[in-house]
Design a protein with these regions (language model features):
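Single conserved hydrophobic/aromatic residue that forms the stacking wall/gate
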Residues: 1-10, 187-195
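Short acidic, glycine/serine/threonine-rich loops at helix termini
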Residues: 57-59, 132-136, 160, 181
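Short, conserved phosphate-binding/catalytic loop or strand-edge motifs used
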Residues: 77-88, 153-155
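Aromatic- and glycine-enriched pocket-lining scaffold segments that form the walls
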Residues: 124-139
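A short, conserved structural fragment
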Residues: 146-147
Length: 195
């Protein structure tokens, strides 16, 4: 069975993900999956190592809650593990400090196309990770997202599904592993090759 688009791939992933997801010590996975699960289907617990459970995540959780997400702390307030009930998010505006980790910003931007009314993200103060934000925007555009800076400190993402396109990832196993992991979760037959 072939996917009709990247959105279908991710939807399939969610349907086959375990209810408890242990990301071990992967901070990027914790941030990105937290946002991803918030717009998906089903109830999940996302957890990690003891050290991961000491790393704050309240900035992202508060932003997701402002968008209407159902995210609760399953342990200590402000830290993983998290209990996430995926659903459609209808709120579209959220504000973050510009000096937070770009991974919080990227996590929100990447789910923007899945939000019912899109996303308007305002960053306050100095934006310290603009180059990383711009990399996220480029990748999103490569997959058909309509996303742009609409002012010096504001980004807008239009609601629309991502599009499946051939995509070249530098032949570096650590970079390519994410794409192979995505395909492996889907239980679909998708053409994937290294060149």
């Amino acid at each position: 069975e072939r996917s009709r688009g990247l959105g279908d791939v991710y939807k399939r992933q969610l349907q086959h993900m375990p209810s408890i997801i242990d990301i071990m010590a992967a901070g990027t996975a914790m941030r990105f999956l937290t946002a991803f699960l918030a717009v998906g289907e089903g109830t999940h617990i996302i957890t990690g190592t003891q050290r991961m459970q000491q790393r704050p995540i309240s900035i992202l959780v508060n932003a997701l809650r402002a968008l209407g997400a159902d995210v609760e702390y399953a342990g200590n307030e402000g830290f993983p593990p998290l209990r996430i009930v995926g659903r459609k998010l209808v709120n579209s505006e959220v504000t973050l400090p510009g000096n937070v980790s770009s991974q919080y910003i990227s996590a929100l931007l990447m789910i923007g196309p899945a939000l019912t009314n899109g996303l308007k993200l305002t960053l306050t103060g100095e934006i310290v990770s603009r180059p990383y934000i711009d990399l996220t925007l480029k990748l999103m555009r490569d997959f058909g997202a309509n996303v742009a800076w609409i002012s010096e400190n504001q980004l807008e993402v239009k609601p629309q599904p991502y599009q499946a396109v051939p995509y070249y990832v530098e032949s570096d196993w650590s970079a390519a592993s994410y794409w192979y992991e995505t395909v492996s979760y889907t239980h679909l037959t998708l053409p994937t090759k290294l060149e």
